[in-house]
Every structure is written in C-alpha cells, then in structure tokens.
Amino acid sequence: MKVTFKKDYLKDFVADSEVELLKPTAGFVRDTLLARTGVGNEMEDWLTLPSDYDKEEFARILKVADKIKSDSKVLVVIGIGGSYLGARAVIEFLKSEFHNEKANKEGLPEVYFVGTSASGRYIDDVIDLIGNRDFSINIISKSGTTTEPAIAFRTFKSLIEKKYGKEEASKRIFATTDAHKGALLNVAKENGYERFVVPDGIGGRYSVLSAVGLLPIAVAGINIQKLMDGAKAAQEEFAKDEDILNKPSILYAIYRNILYRKGFDVETIVGYEPQFRFLFEWWKQLMAESEGKDNKGIYPTSAIFSTDLHSIGQYIQDGKKILFETILDITKPISDRVVPSADDNTDNLDYILNKPMKEVNEAALTATAQAHTSAGVPNILLQLDDLDEFNLGNLIYFFEAAVAVSGYLDGINPFDQPGVEIYKTNMFKILGKPGYTD
C-alpha cells in the first residue's frame, strides 16, 4: 500500500538514459536530506515526524477532539496557508466536499475554516451558519499576528465570549502556536486555553501531520493514527537503503526535473473526483513555496476532470506546450454507483447500461491522457490503492519528500519562503501599522 509511479505516458518525452543520468545526483540529494547537511536543514523535522512525534500531545489531541465532538456542533478553525490547507485537504479528500452537510447525520461537528482571507462577507456567512449552535475554536498561528487570521480570531473570540462568558469560552478555545514565544502564546497563557505546538523545525506547508492539522482532522472523525501509520511507511521506504529508482517519490522528482529542463514550466495536477480539490490546493502551496524562488521553479496548477476538460482542456490539447500533467488516481472504486436504466434510450446511453461509474471515469482518464500525450503534453500517473487514511498519509509524505528532492536538484532551498513576506510588509505600510512607513 504505497504510491505507485507510472510512466506509461512518458516514453515519448523522457528516455530511460536521462533518468539514469540523474540517478547519482538524486541519490546524493536523498542522502543529504537524511543526513541533514543541506541548505535549510534546520527545517527538516518533517522527515522523521511520522515516527518521532510527541505521543503525549497526540493523546491530548484525541482527548480534545472527543470533547469538541461531545459539546460542539461546529468547530471554527482559524488559520491561513499551511495552518489550514493541510487539515482541509485531508478532511475533504477522505470525507467529501459535502462533509459539513453530512456531519450531523454522522454525529460529528461541522468544521469551518476562517482567517484564510480578509473577506468580511465570508466571516458573516460562517457566523450565520453557526447561528445559535454550540461551537469551539481552534486558532492556529505560530506568531498570532498574521493579519487575516488575527482579525478572524478577534471576531470569533468576541462571539464565543459573548455566548458563553470568558471562563466557559476559555474551555472552548484551543490554541496551536509556538511553544516559547509570540502574541498568541501570551494570549493563550493569560486566558488558560489548552495549547498545542507548532513545531519549530517544520514549515507550515509541511505541518499537516503535526498538531497544526491533526486536531481539526480528528474532530472530523478521521483516524489520525492510521494517517500517521501511512506516512511512517512512506518515511521508512524513503530512508531504506535500496536502488533509489525503486522509490516513487524520487522517480517523481527526477521526471519533474527532466521535464522542467526541457521547457515544461507548468505542472497541472489532475484528479477525476471533486473531493480532491483541496488536496490539490495543499499540493500547490507545497510545490510553489518550496520551488518558486531565485527565478526558478515549476508553476503548480490544478484541475478536476471531466469538469475542467470543458474549460482549460482546450488549452491543454491545442495551446502552447508549456505544461505537463500529473494524474492522481485511486485504483479501488470509491462508489458502487452504476449507470442507471431508463424508460427509453433517447440519450443513447444503453451501451453503458449498468457499467460502474468508476469504469466510465477510468475511460475518461485513459482517453484524456492519450489525447493530451498525443498532442505533446507529458502525463505522469500516480496511483493510490484506496481512499483511506493510510494511503493518504503515505501520499502526503510522498509529496513532501519529492518536492524536497526536486528543490535540491534545482539548486534551491525548498524549506524557506522569503517572497511571502513582501506583500505583508506592503500591506502593513498601506494600513498604517506602527513601525512600517515608506
């Protein structure tokens, strides 16, 4: 049960000899990562996180998740970037885009994410959705001063204190923040919020398997131990002393790098299930922040087919050949629905009568990959055995390891994100924050 890398649609674009040529460098890069001797090594604790995590904190996460499930109809998760994308990705990938609509039937709280933008309307909508129901808050921020989540926390902190009073509200607010410093840590201490740690040696985009992601994920009814087990299996596979071309994450990094050097500057990750959407949003942050620097890097985009075949599909087929696709497929059917019968055959669908929808979807996948590769668009195929916690944990670590290797192959530090700070500084100047002037 691991990610399978398939090169069926790559033979016209990458020769085996090209892969062999990069093999020694990729092996050196993998060893550099494991030895933690490369640039940015102070931010590589994600490498061993699936096996070396705080077991006491993990137990508290489970306990708090049970409390929230028992006393709240809604959990409001406040965070931006890596402080929310991982959790939302896991929840929607495993539960569906309609997890909140289905939550009450499953006896689970609805989970809403705020602080992801400066939209007042979005906050209004979430407050309307909560209504008079019981709710809790998980505020996730290393510093507590990032503008968008800080505004959201002010808003929902006031709301929850007005509803329950400060003492009871303090039992419903859970802070995931820096262990030693920061505005949010101070607020949490002053108010007696239960605290979880944003790890020092793990960047936000690599943090989904820490308390940053695990508390909201557990509240949504997902087995976080199985998620960690899947990631641990991927960790062990990545570190195992064997031919590195047997490692799917390294193969993925090598092929991406070769395609990039050939002028394919854009990677579109593609799925055929709508519930993949936010996993792809997490993937985009992981790839863009890790690789997009020093005027280098593959630009990551995403698409959900067949939907987007009827919009950007035209460009992929007939437009400028600047992109390659990475397809994510689940081999086991995730639904037993079949094409239904009808009183007549005016829609001419009887030729697929009673065929599983999975078979129709797979036909679309194969047909599209054939069409795009024939038009000069390389396609990488990644397969998971099943849509479950173990396989997703494995996939998360797969992507993290792959982009780390890919970044080093491209000669950049895949663990910093200096460009993100520039808009923040400009925004502070525009809004007149003390200490920020032209």
UniProtKB/Swiss-Prot annotation:
Molecular function via GO: carbohydrate derivative binding; glucose-6-phosphate isomerase activity; monosaccharide binding
A single cellular component GO annotation: cytosol
Signal peptide (UniProt feature, chain positions): none
Catalytic residues as annotated in Swiss-Prot or TrEMBL: E289 (proton donor), H310, K424
Reaction(s) the record says it catalyses: alpha-D-glucose 6-phosphate = beta-D-fructose 6-phosphate
PANTHER family: GLUCOSE-6-PHOSPHATE ISOMERASE (PTHR11469:SF1)
Protein family per UniProt: Belongs to the GPI family.
Name of the protein described by the UniProt record: Glucose-6-phosphate isomerase
Gene encoding the protein: pgi
